[in-house]
């Protein structure tokens, strides 16, 4: 069987992303193993608060093929972050953690030739700090990708906008 995992960066630790993740991991439509990059401590705190009972498989080797990956467990690459509570107010305190998660993800994507990547939400004001229009541009720059697309997906519809985060006055120039 071809090794083709989905790599997920949880993003802002104080968002609802992990709650959504916990609800989606048992979806039968997901055929590929999922590998989550997040904090084990945060994961355990939020699992306890949300009463989620799922085993966690810690992945230690960045060469993913050398690890056991399970479909029935949360495959986690731990990034150090020490919250005191499961949910706190969103602030710039989590920027270093988010940055470390993305750096690790980019390294793993390059090393393992990962083709499926999902990122959780981030706060543009605190994390991107006006250096990038959005997370799509941040990821593109870090991975040195010139042509990118966002995919917005739900049960009813999948949409890929013609442009990414772009002020309206520049849209016409970008699509010509």
Q: Language model features by range: what are they?
A:
Residues 1-176:
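Anion-binding alpha/beta catalytic cores of soluble intermediary-metabolism enzymes, centered on
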């Amino acid at each position: 069987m071809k090794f083709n995992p989905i790599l997920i960066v949880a993003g802002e630790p104080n968002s609802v992303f992990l709650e959504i993740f916990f609800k989606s991991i048992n979806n039968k439509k997901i055929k590929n193993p999922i590998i989550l990059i997040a904090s084990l401590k945060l994961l355990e705190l939020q699992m306890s608060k949300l009463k989620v009972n799922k085993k966690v498989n810690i992945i230690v080797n960045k060469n993913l093929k050398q690890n056991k990956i399970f479909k029935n467990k949360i495959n986690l690459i731990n990034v150090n972050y020490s919250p005191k509570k499961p949910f706190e107010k969103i602030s710039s305190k989590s920027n270093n953690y988010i940055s470390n998660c993305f750096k690790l993800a980019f390294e793993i994507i390059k090393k393992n030739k990962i083709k499926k990547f999902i990122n959780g939400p981030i706060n543009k004001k605190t994390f991107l700090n006006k250096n990038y229009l959005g997370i799509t541009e941040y990821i593109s720059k870090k991975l040195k990708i010139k042509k990118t697309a966002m995919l917005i997906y739900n049960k009813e519809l999948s949409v890929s906008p013609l442009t990414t985060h772009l002020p309206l006055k520049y849209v016409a120039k970008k699509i010509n």
